[in-house]
């Protein structure tokens, strides 16, 4: 099972509060493990202007209002930009399933600040990571549902609606989900 480019949708039984109602885009997945970015946990207290100011990068007012998201609990001081594929860093962009790009280098922030970045982007601090077999085990234990990622769901919907819309894409009404899971 290759989950690269798929969305993980947290089940109500998710015990870790950092992942409660989380929607995660899986950016890399192999037998060695998985890496993803939470796309629906904005950090209202941190704007991209704070990050750009720390890095001494000048930007327009529009750019400065961009919200930074909590990408996951691993390396929370490290920045990632999840973006549309109209942009590729000359240094290092990971193309995720042909549909998304992920860049973690300074040049993308400079280009976003200068208005030359990707058409769609989410700035993240941190990421979610799993060791080999760990994510597959969590899915088997009913911790996550998986669904296809769409640009609309990832970039266009407000963060507060992404979890319920990801469930709706599977034909699941969140109201009908139970925090208790079992196996038939």
UniProtKB/Swiss-Prot annotation:
Signal peptide (from-to) = none
Q: Which SUPFAM superfamilies match?
A: VC0467-like (SSF143456)
Task: Kindly list the GO CC terms recorded for this protein.
Answer: cytosol
- Identify the domain of life: Bacteria
Q: Which Gene3D superfamilies match?
A: VC0467-like
Matching Pfam families: DUF179
Protein family membership: Belongs to the UPF0301 (AlgH) family.
UniProt-listed PANTHER family: UNCHARACTERIZED PROTEIN YQGE, UPF0301 PROTEIN YQGE
Q: What is this protein called?
A: UPF0301 protein RD1_3419
User: Could you tell me which species this protein originates from?
Assistant: Roseobacter denitrificans (strain ATCC 33942 / OCh 114) (Erythrobacter sp. (strain OCh 114))
């Amino acid at each position: 099972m290759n989950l690269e480019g798929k969305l993980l949708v947290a089940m109500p039984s998710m015990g870790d509060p950092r992942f409660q109602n989380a929607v995660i885009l899986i950016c890399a997945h192999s037998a060695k493990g998985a890496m993803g970015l939470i796309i629906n946990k904005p950090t209202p207290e941190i704007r991209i202007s704070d990050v750009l100011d720390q890095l001494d990068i000048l930007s327009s007012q529009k750019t400065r209002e961009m919200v930074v998201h909590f990408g996951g609990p691993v390396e929370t001081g490290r920045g990632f930009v999840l973006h549309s594929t109209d942009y590729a860093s000359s240094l290092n962009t990971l193309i995720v399933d042909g549909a998304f790009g992920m860049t973690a280098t300074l040049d993308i922030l400079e280009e976003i600040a200068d208005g030359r970045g990707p058409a769609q982007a989410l700035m993240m601090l941190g990421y979610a990571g799993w060791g080999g077999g760990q994510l597959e085990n969590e899915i088997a234990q009913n911790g996550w549902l998986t669904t296809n990622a769409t640009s609309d769901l990832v970039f266009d919907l407000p963060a507060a609606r992404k979890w319920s819309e990801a469930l709706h894409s599977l034909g699941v009404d969140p109201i009908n989900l139970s925090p208790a899971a079992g196996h038939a």
